Structure formats: structure tokens, C-alpha cells
């Protein structure tokens, strides 16, 4: 939720600024309302019936399918994904990835890296994913190549938990 849509519930000045400087969609749709299947649709360009990823609990994404990161990579782009994957498989078609297994945790979350090691990182997941993404862009990518970085945040998923310092932000509302 963003206050540029309804100011009664939240205060989001930075997101509101981005919305006022860019495009804000008042009527938009997704191919699937669940995060994993929706992500599979975006990656493949196919509906769930075509990519065979129907739900968040019984499906495993078939990484042999064509995806837009694979096409970009084949055409000289450096590709990366950092954050929530939730496709019950490991990413394919990326030069770099570090993903949150399953739904992930808001506080001190685990990440799986390209060596298939699970590493617990201390902090709030939004800040960690953001900082890891900035670090990859500034320090790890090949600056001679165009790039595509998918930054998949957890914090848009229930249950919604803020950073510890913001837990009392709306106590009086």
C-alpha cells in the first residue's frame, strides 16, 4: 500500500515521490495472483498453463524453459537476481544470483548463493536485498556490459513486518 493511492493508512513519501515523477497504474492486472506463479509467468512470458508452475506449494519451476534473462544473457547482457525466488528450484540463466529460499524471513533471513550454500544474514530483509543489489551493481558487475538485475523484495508479502525501528510507527492509528 502506498499513500499516493490512499492516505488514510500509511505514509510513504519516497514511494509517492517516485509515483509522481513516473507512471502510476490505477488499473493493472497480473497473469497469476500468487507470487511464485506470477514470477514464472514474467520470466517465461507464458501463462501458468504453459510454464506449468501453478501454485506456491506443489510446483517446481522447470529451469530448462526459455526465459527473458536467458535471452538477454545470450545477447551480451550480464544478468543477476537478488532476493525472493520462491520457485522451488535454483535460478538458471543468470550470471549471478543470491536468493531467499521459500517465503523467507523478515529478520535475519537465509540466502542461498551460487555455491548452493545457505547463509544467514543479520538484518532486515529489505535493507539486505537493497544493499546486496547496490553492491552487485557498484562492485561486482562487468561495467563494460549492459545488465539486467532483478531485485525481488520479500516485504510486499504477508505477514507484513516492518524494520524493528519502525514497529511503533502506526501505534496511534
Cite the ranges covered by each PLM segment.
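Formylglycine-dependent sulfatase
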Residues: 1-173
Amino acid at each position: 500500500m502506498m499513500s499516493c493511492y490512499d492516505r488514510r493508512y500509511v505514509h510513504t513519501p519516497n514511494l509517492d515521490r517516485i509515483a509522481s515523477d513516473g507512471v502510476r497504474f490505477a488499473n493493472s492486472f497480473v497473469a497469476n495472483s500468487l507470487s511464485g506463479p506470477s514470477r514464472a509467468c514474467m520470466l517465461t512470458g507464458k501463462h501458468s498453463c504453459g510454464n506449468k508452475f501453478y501454485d506456491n506449494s506443489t510446483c517446481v519451476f522447470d529451469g530448462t524453459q526459455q526465459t527473458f534473462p536467458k535471452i538477454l544473457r545470450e545477447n551480451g547482457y550480464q544478468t543477476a537476481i537478488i532476493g525472493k525466488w520462491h520457485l522451488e528450484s535454483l535460478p538458471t540463466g543468470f550470471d549471478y544470483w543470491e536468493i531467499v529460499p521459500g517465503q523467507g524471513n523478515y529478520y535475519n533471513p537465509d540466502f542461498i548463493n551460487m555455491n548452493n550454500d545457505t547463509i544467514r544474514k543479520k538484518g532486515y530483509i529489505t535493507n539486505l536485498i537493497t544493499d546486496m543489489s547496490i553492491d552487485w551493481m557498484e562492485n561486482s558487475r562487468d561495467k563494460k556490459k549492459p545488465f539486467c538485475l532483478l531485485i525481488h523484495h520479500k516485504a510486499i508479502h504477508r505477514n507484513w513486518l516492518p524494520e524493528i525501528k519502525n514497529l511503533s510507527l502506526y501505534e496511534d492509528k
